[in-house]
Amino acid sequence: NAAIVTYDYALSANSQTIQFVALGETKSLQIVSTRQKKVNGKPSGGVEKVDTTAQITGTGFSQTSSETSNGENYSIVAAENKAETDNNGSITITQTESNKTVNVTLTQLAAAVTYEYTCTVDPTTLSFAAAGETKIFGVTATKQKKVNGSNSGIPSAVTYTTTVQGEGFTKGSSEYSVVAAANTGAQRTGTAVVTTTEGNKTATVTLTQLA
């Protein structure tokens, strides 16, 4: 009788899921792809390597491969994820002769969204006449959105409140005005502290009124 020749195929990956950081990175996937020749059901010769192909899906994922002694090493690249949701994909490895497949899930974390707050005043000192008067000052209160640590868009304005302290000084009709009452005594001082409603940033205007 003629000998019956068959092959036992094996295909495996060293990971079922690969996770990537939002900034993007490269990770390795090791594939073992082999066949064992059998004659009349018994192993004949050594284990042989079998080629594989890869199909990758998902936004921002790509791959390159290099040969190993018993399969292939796939280098999987995830580009930066700037979305505020996780980025998902997959890579399917197919063994060329047997059509066996192994599927590996690719997950990438959502972008890290933070805000940087600023609060400045101009000028930082105000001087008032002894007779009393109202003065205004400039306030810049903003927030800058950052995605993965880099600026996204332009700064936007945030609201703020002002607290005035010191004898004879009160807040005026707006959050950026100070009223000094008439001073009949020695020189006096106070402060106007501006605080952003988001981010809790502060800036201080020093107030002085002449004797």
Question: What positions do the PLM features span?
Answer:
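Surface-exposed binding patches on compact interaction domains or structured appendages
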Residues: 13, 36-75, 138-140, 144-177
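Beta-sheet-dominated interaction scaffolds and their linkers
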Residues: 2-34, 114-142
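Short, surface-exposed loop/turn segments at beta-strand-coil junctions that are enriched for proline
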Residues: 79-85, 181-186
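Interdomain boundary/hinge segments at the C-termini of tandem beta-sandwich modules
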Residues: 1-7, 104-113, 205-211
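A short beta-strand micro-motif common to beta-rich folds, especially ectodomain repeats
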Residues: 85-97, 187-198, 205
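Surface-exposed or flexible loop/turn and strand-edge residues in extracellular/cell-surface modules
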Residues: 15, 26, 88, 101-103, ...
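Surface-exposed loop/turn motifs at beta-strand-loop junctions within extracellular Ig-like
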Residues: 35, 80, 95-97, 143, ...
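Solvent-exposed strand-loop boundary residues in beta-sheet-rich modules
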Residues: 60, 97-99, 166-168, 198-200
